[in-house]
Structure formats: structure tokens, C-alpha cells
């Protein structure tokens, strides 16, 4: 995917609230003729859905390249490291690092141990072959972290561009 010289076209899919994995994967199969990769969302709007890594893995097996969206909202360090190791083990090495949508007032409790910047750093540590506690990873593989930012409504704020620049400096 990164070898192209022009624009990359990606499509986004949100896993369904279902136990039918084939249905969630099947809805993106026709995208292979127009998209270079499929972004798989991670419980958007802070709502439970079929596990995004499972869906991403199946899409990858079908021959499409995938970008796993990963939020720090719902997981602590141990869970995030486990998800990243799992992603690498099934060939999913592109991760869009996000802080995550916040829940409604009476919604679930969020973890927020890692924001998007923290996830980018964590991805780079794991790409370097260790976990954050120094444990060596057997058969380490690279992660290609990505970042997103909402600049459209925030360009009037002086910190908007510096937030994006920080993500880029951290390796996104």
C-alpha cells in the first residue's frame, strides 16, 4: 500500500452489532476495486460492536489491506499492548491511533490511560521489539502508526497545528 506514488484511497467500515463475522466482512468486499485499504473503526461513539481486530483480521485474510483504528479510551496499557501484538500476529500492521469518542453522560466508564499521542509512542516502542516494561518481543514486527486530527473547526486555535505536528514528530 505504501509503495504507491499517488493518493491512497481508503474506505471506512464500522463492525456491526452482531455475532455474524461473515456479514461484517462481506459488506466491504466490493471495495477492493476502489480502495487501497479499509479502515476498521474501534467502537465509534463509545458503543459496543463486534471486535475491530477480529474484523480487520478477516478483511486482511480476504486480500484487502486494512488499517486498524485503535483508541486508548477503553483499554489500559496491558490491553493495548496485547491488541497490538495480536494485530501484528495476524498481519495487521497499520494502526490509526485515536483517543476515542467520549461517552454520553450516563455511558460507560472510560480508561483513557493513553491518548492518541501515547498510542503512537506505544506503537513505536513495540516496533522496537519490546513492551513498555522492557520485556523482549519474540519475532518483533514493525507497526506503522497513523494519526488523525480535526483541523477544520480548530484552525483558529493556536495549538491546533502544534498538536498535529507533535503526532508527526512522534512517528505518525
Report residues per predicted region.
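Domain-level signal for soluble alpha/beta catalytic cores
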Residues: 1-172
Amino acid at each position: 500500500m505504501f509503495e504507491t506514488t499517488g493518493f491512497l484511497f481508503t474506505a471506512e467500515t464500522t463492525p456491526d452489532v452482531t455475532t455474524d463475522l461473515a456479514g461484517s466482512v462481506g459488506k466491504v468486499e466490493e471495495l477492493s476495486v476502489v480502495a487501497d485499504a479499509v479502515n476498521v473503526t474501534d467502537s465509534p461513539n463509545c458503543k459496543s460492536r463486534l471486535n475491530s481486530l477480529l474484523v480487520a483480521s478477516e478483511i486482511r485474510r480476504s486480500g484487502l489491506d486494512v488499517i486498524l483504528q485503535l483508541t486508548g479510551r477503553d483499554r489500559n496499557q496491558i490491553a493495548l499492548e496485547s491488541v497490538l501484538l495480536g494485530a501484528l500476529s495476524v498481519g495487521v500492521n497499520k494502526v490509526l491511533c485515536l483517543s476515542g469518542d467520549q461517552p454520553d453522560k450516563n455511558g460507560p466508564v472510560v480508561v483513557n490511560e493513553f491518548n492518541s499521542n501515547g498510542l503512537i509512542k506505544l506503537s513505536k516502542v513495540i516496533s522496537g521489539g519490546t513492551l513498555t516494561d522492557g520485556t523482549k518481543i519474540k519475532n518483533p514486527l514493525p507497526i506503522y502508526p497513523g494519526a488523525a486530527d480535526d483541523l477544520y473547526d480548530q484552525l483558529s486555535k493556536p495549538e491546533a497545528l502544534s498538536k498535529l505536528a507533535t503526532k508527526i514528530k512522534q512517528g505518525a
